[in-house]
Design a protein with these regions (language model features):
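Generic N-terminal segment detector
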Residues: 1-47, 299, 312, 333-336
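Extended, loop-rich substrate-binding clefts of extracytoplasmic carbohydrate-active enzymes
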Residues: 1-10, 19, 87-88, 92-155
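Acidic, contiguous internal or C-terminal segments within carbohydrate-active enzymes
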Residues: 18, 29, 40, 130-180, ...
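Acidic/His-leaning functional-site neighborhoods
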Residues: 23, 100-114, 231-308, 312-315
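Acidic-aromatic substrate-binding/catalytic surfaces of carbohydrate-active enzymes
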Residues: 24-88, 294
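Short, hydrophobic/aromatic-enriched beta-strand segments in well-ordered soluble domains
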Residues: 27, 127-129, 264, 323-334
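Short Pro-Gly-centered flexible turn/kink motifs
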Residues: 82-91, 162, 318-335
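Active-site/ligand-binding surface loops and adjacent short beta/alpha elements
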Residues: 90, 171-172, 181-276
Length: 336
């Protein structure tokens, strides 16, 4: 496969097609710069959930359940309330069943393409969204910021970086999540029921019927939870409804690894989802376990972190001062 990076149209929509190191990636700038597709072409592994017939139509209709969307703000805020050190914001409730505000808004915005290029054996793309009074959500959240995404594809997989810059005169809460949807099964040789997930979980964070944290906010791992640690947690055929964990590191190929490892026990192939230390938590969800996907989601803060009466170092809550930036990085690759 030759290295290339170019803008094309897919399903009638402009996207960025990246090819490098035996991988194929498709970035959808008009849908939050979602990584709409990631494929290990050499080993015929479809890593992320992707609809081949109408990929962009499906993605646009359900941007949290295809590909790799970037969420700001992550997960749920109780009653739509966001408490910041210098203000309290009231967001519209968009999860009527539980009366929460969920998943933020950035994953639905149309980004500007800043750069599309190759550099040796690397394909590189970057996109940007400027959030200000022109955004329809600004009436609820009048805090200007800039969102920058960079994607680098090479033989080591997909490297992702996400930067938020506070362009306002207010404090800006910094919480990031990727609602990453992995394909089940990963290849034609695989069976969905044979997928297993490994996480370096150290504490379980229980939630109530509204999927909000409840005391005690951190519990010791049960026998069920230990399946994640051992890498024996099934992802399909039974419901997983927001298993939330604080994570540490584990050993992968003799190196410290912070993130999730997915094993296809049919073939032995592994998908490694490595995230930086800012992601202190993972939450796992599989839409009742009856679909063709499952979502291990890295989060920089736990659910409803801004509103919890807990120290910031416990919840992962962070704020950016005016003019301040913060970047997180991730990498997805296969081990065959």
């Amino acid at each position: 496969m030759n290295t290339s990076c170019k803008e094309i149209r897919l399903d009638g929509v402009p996207v960025i097609e990246m090819k490098a190191g035996g991988y194929l990636a498709i970035i959808a700038p008009t849908v939050g710069s979602n990584v709409a597709r990631l494929r290990d072409c050499n080993n015929k592994i479809e890593i992320l959930r992707y609809n081949k017939e109408r990929p962009m139509r499906k993605l646009a209709s359900s941007p949290c359940t295809y590909g790799m969307p970037t969420l700001y703000l992550p997960n749920r805020l109780k009653n739509g309330v966001l408490k910041v050190s210098d203000a309290t914001y009231q967001f519209p409730v968009n999860e009527g069943r539980f009366q929460n505000f969920i998943h933020g808004f950035l994953h639905t915005r149309s980004y500007e393409v800043i750069d599309v290029k190759t550099d040796g054996d690397k394909a590189i793309a970057s996109t940007r969204y400027v959030y200000d009074e022109k955004d329809p959500f600004f009436e609820y959240y009048p805090v200007k910021f800039q969102s920058d995404l960079e994607f680098i594809l090479d033989e080591n997989g997909l490297n992702y970086s996400f930067t938020l810059t506070n362009q306002s005169d207010k404090q800006m809460p910094y919480g990031v999540c990727n609602h990453t949807s992995f394909q089940a099964p990963h290849s034609k040789k695989s069976l969905a029921k044979d997928i297993r997930l490994r996480l370096p979980a150290v504490k379980r964070l229980p939630v109530d019927f509204r999927q909000l944290p409840i005391p005690p906010y951190k519990k010791e791992l049960s026998a069920y939870d230990e399946n994640y640690v051992k890498g024996t947690a099934h992802m399909i055929k039974f419901p997983i409804n927001n298993d939330m964990y604080e994570i540490d590191t584990m050993d992968v190929e003799g190196k410290k690894f912070h993130g999730a490892v997915i094993t296809d026990t049919t073939t032995g192939n592994r998908i490694c989802y490595e995230v930086d230390d800012a992601f202190k938590f993972f939450i796992v969800w599989n839409d009742r376990g009856t679909k063709d996907y499952y979502c291990p989601e890295p989060m920089s803060w736990m659910i409803d972190a801004p509103n919890l009466d807990l120290p910031a170092e416990e919840t992962g809550y962070v704020e950016l001062a005016p003019g301040e930036s913060k970047t997180v990085t991730e990498r997805i690759y296969t081990l065959v």
